[in-house]
Amino acid sequence: MTCVYLGNQHQPGSNGLVNIEEIGGDNSKVQMEPDSTEDHEGDVICCAFRHQVGGHKCVLQVTENLICKPCEESERIFYNNVPAILQPYVPGYRGEVSVYCKENGGHKTLHAKVSKSILRSCRTYADGNCEIEEGNWGKTRLNYCIKNESLWKNNSPEKFIMFDNLIANFERPCALDIKLCRYYHGMCSDPSKKLVLEQKCNNSTSSTLGFRIGGMQIYQHETRKMLQFNKHYGMSINDHQVIELLKIFFGRRSGTSIRDISNTIKNIHNAVLNQKDFIFLSVSLLFFYDIQETQHSVPLFQPEADLDAKGQNPAKAGCKVRLIDFEKVIPVSDEEEHLIPQHLKENINFGITNLSNILDGFAIENDLIKD
């Protein structure tokens, strides 16, 4: 919930920047096949989720309202035991689902066995082509997952965990994934991989700000395209560049008071500190909002109360934020919990405090503009 992956696109360049094609086109229906073996389950053909922001996992769109990602045991434990104080700040969890790969005449499709009771409450439409075609972004991305994450070996089904799609029905979803992690968490037994992970923290804004941008996509009015920044870009920029990128994302087009966003971050931080069930070695904050088209170009950073040429706010319902990616969240009851150093138990505090302080600075700047 950190790079961005969009359907039917070229792979990002070395600078981490991708221009996204013009938005438009009809949705494709998710095909439902009769299930003769399990009366209570439906067989749904899945698509690669076009608007994945952040992470390296294979995220699939099950229906218009549901997405899923490969199941990590630590994340499954967290979602099944979310402390009440954190529930308003995490995506709606829909349980586990079995995903398998079918190949017919050289063409692959991914299928999920989903409870019919869940499907009845969901719209069975998804964006994009569900067949993993040659040259299609879905094929490139999913083949990477199959090779590097060892998914669907020997055509065996894989366990995924399923969530509500936070941007269902969005027209132009803008999203930002911020990874909170000041120090490398140490949860890797492979020495070479451990070194790479340590360098990611030491050589990025994780070490200076306590967070780094893992991915962002934002709508450009001038070009009518999405502008995308992936995790490699986020690891290559300095503190000043991060702040400028945040200023763009949380500018007036987000449709929400920056103070409100900052206060929500503070509330999330307090909720994490006050819960006693889990230790957060690393986690991500996902910010998202929808953009409406306007007739005229508007500045990116002006007082939030300003309206567009039609007297309307250009964003729908404002910017929202959720905690995501709980693979590095450890139950306090874990038998090795006592081995975790105190500075790692407080690993997200520095970053989330800095982030809210930066947004408070934006709010003060807005106040000066108004005056």
Task: Give the positions of each predicted feature.
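Polybasic, positively charged surfaces/segments
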Residues: M1-D371
